[in-house]
Design a protein with these regions (language model features):
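Membrane-embedded transmembrane helical bundles of large multi-pass transporters/channels
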Residues: 1-216
Length: 216
């Protein structure tokens, strides 16, 4: 199902497959490292591999999205449809697109994943062995995601050539404008009076939830 969602978004079997494959590699490496460290999967952390898979897919999607922007438009997907279509002539080859994607996402990706590692590692202060093992499992998994999504995936993308590039580019342009009316309608809420109404409604909901939360 995850692969299907990625395919519908990227319109590419190759990009969807590479993202899922790198996420699975992160999970397999995590299980192998845990075995080497003398740990295993118990009922407490049996869902951790799925969590690591989801995190890896999320960061992998960012990489393929930037890669696709480079091979379609030669940069970020910013500007009007006509501007993006005109930038199609600046599209780069897969090798250069992978290099640019790696350079742009390496630092923010590492910072984000290291923050996740620190967050999971902080759970180890709880003096319960099963909880500490859960923290170790998640920390190792997120750390390995740095290698799979920020190093392995760009290398694989550098060898990836997409077919029907012009058709995929036009489809992406339609994707970018598909929800313009929805965003235009929601942008009304950014005005002072509608924004104040939203804040007031949120305050009422918070107070209601706080009152009933004490009874749980």
């Amino acid at each position: 199902f995850t692969w299907l969602l990625l395919y519908l978004y990227s319109t590419s079997v190759k990009l969807a497959s590479l993202t899922v494959a790198c996420a699975l590699v992160a999970v397999v490496w995590m299980l192998g490292c845990l075995r080497l460290m003398g740990f295993g999967i118990d009922p407490m952390n049996m869902l951790t591999p799925f969590l690591i898979f989801a995190i890896a897919v999320s960061h992998g999607e960012q990489m393929i999205n930037r890669f696709r922007g480079e091979i379609f438009f030669g940069g970020l997907e910013e500007g009007t449809v006509d501007e993006l279509r005109a930038r199609g002539k600046f599209a780069v080859e897969p090798l250069e697109a992978a290099r640019l994607s790696f350079r742009m996402l390496l630092v923010p990706g590492i910072v984000a994943l290291l923050a996740g590692c620190i967050g999971f590692a902080a759970i180890m202060v709880i003096p319960i062995d099963m909880v500490r093992e859960l923290a170790i499992t998640a920390t190792v998994g997120v750390a390995l995601t740095i290698l799979t999504d920020l190093v392995l995936l760009p290398v694989l993308l550098s060898y990836t050539r997409l077919r029907n590039l012009d058709r995929k580019r036009e489809f992406r342009l339609r994707q970018l404008t598909r929800f313009d009316k929805v965003w235009a309608a929601l942008s009304v809420l950014a005005r002072p009076k509608p924004a104040a109404a939203v804040i007031a409604l949120g305050t009422v909901i918070w107070f209601f939830a706080w009152q009933h939360g004490n009874n749980v």
